[in-house]
A protein has these predicted regions:
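A short glycine-rich, Lys/Arg-flanked "PGG" loop and its adjoining helix->strand segment in the class I
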Residues: 204-216
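Class I (Rossmann-like) S-adenosyl-L-methionine-dependent methyltransferase catalytic domain
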Residues: 2-103, 112-178, 205, 219-297
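Helix-capping/helix-break motifs at membrane-protein junctions
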Residues: 199-200
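A conserved beta-strand element that flanks and buttresses the S-adenosyl-L-methionine
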Residues: 190
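Short catalytic micro-motifs in class I SAM-dependent methyltransferases
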Residues: 193-194
């Protein structure tokens, strides 16, 4: 398949590895820092001058929301990363015929719209996106920002009642979360790095929900941490040394901060759910992108 990279899992040593490991022991999840008022004020203050200098940055969400979703682990100077990171994903999706400009698309864990803004702001081969795009997330602040910055004709965003330790949500815990959308209603269900924060029971729940919501022939695409295709940060920021069931986790104190799985386990689970085909694909750029679990209904 196009864009699949045999070398995407190869990684090398990184500078500052010791410092990075030390910082990650103190702060396994930078997302939690973005709820601190002092941290928010500081990082948003650094955003003022770039917004004045570059018109392209003025439509971006505030810096603390960008940091919360993970923009290359950068606290500052992350604007370009936010703007371009989804480009290869959509080029792959449309060039491979996984979705079209008229498709119904569900983004689970939409955050502040890093993937959605491409379908709002850009044309593909001269055609504008005219389908429907639904984004769901547990982060009420991020969803509110999206609702205020996207047109309601094509885009709809709503808050999930699911829970997450890493994302500081306070809703009542549920063992099984059902996304309040109709069966067989989407051509593409995808997420960016959602699975990297899901332990086994929640992982299975979201894979089953993806299957339920897809139309026949539709595709599920979830980026994730994969032991057989390790990230560029493997051996520095990430080691996944702790096992919890079929999951490999980075931090026992905050197990949802970073979760990885083996390919065989993911494929077996997806086939049990009912998907007809499963594969791991990589976007251009190699290990800087997470591998994607691509399954067809």
């Amino acid at each position: 398949m196009a864009y699949t990279s045999a070398n995407a899992g190869q990684v090398g040593p990184a500078r500052g590895a010791s410092l990075d490991r030390a910082l990650r022991k103190l702060f396994p999840s930078t997302s939690k820092l973005t709820f601190n008022p002092l941290f928010r004020a500081a990082v948003n203050a650094f955003d003022v001058v770039p917004r004045l200098m570059f018109p392209e940055f003025r439509t971006l969400p505030p810096n603390h929301l960008r940091i919360r979703i993970g923009v290359g682990n950068r606290i500052l100077n992350n604007q370009t990363h936010f703007l371009v990171h989804a480009r290869d994903f959509w080029m792959f999706v449309f060039s491979e015929g996984i979705a079209t400009m008229h498709s119904d698309i569900l983004d689970i864990g939409v955050g502040c719209g890093r993937w959605a803004h491409w379908l709002r702001d850009y044309n593909f081969r001269g055609r504008q996106f005219t389908g429907t795009y639904v984004g769901v997330d547990i982060d009420e602040e991020a969803i509110a920002w999206c609702q205020n910055h996207y047109d309601s004709e094509r885009f709809r965003f709503f808050v999930s009642t699911d829970t997450s330790v890493s994302y500081h949500h306070t809703a009542a815990s549920q063992s099984v979360y059902r996304i309040p959308l109709a069966d067989d209603s989407f051509d593409l269900v995808f997420s960016n790095s959602l699975l990297t924060h899901l332990l086994e029971a929640e992982l299975e729940n979201y894979l089953r929900e993806s299957y339920r919501l897809l139309r026949a022939g539709g595709a599920m695409m979830h980026s994730h941490f994969n032991i057989e295709h390790p990230p560029a940060t493997y051996g520095t920021r990430h080691t996944f040394r702790h096992q919890m069931g079929n999951a490999q986790i980075e931090s026992e104190a905050q197990p949802e901060a970073a979760v990885a799985y083996h390919t065989d386990f993911l494929f077996g689970l997806c086939r049990k759910i009912g998907f007809s085909s499963c594969e791991i694909v990589h976007m251009p750029g190699g290990a800087q992108h997470q591998p994607i679990l691509l399954c067809r209904k």
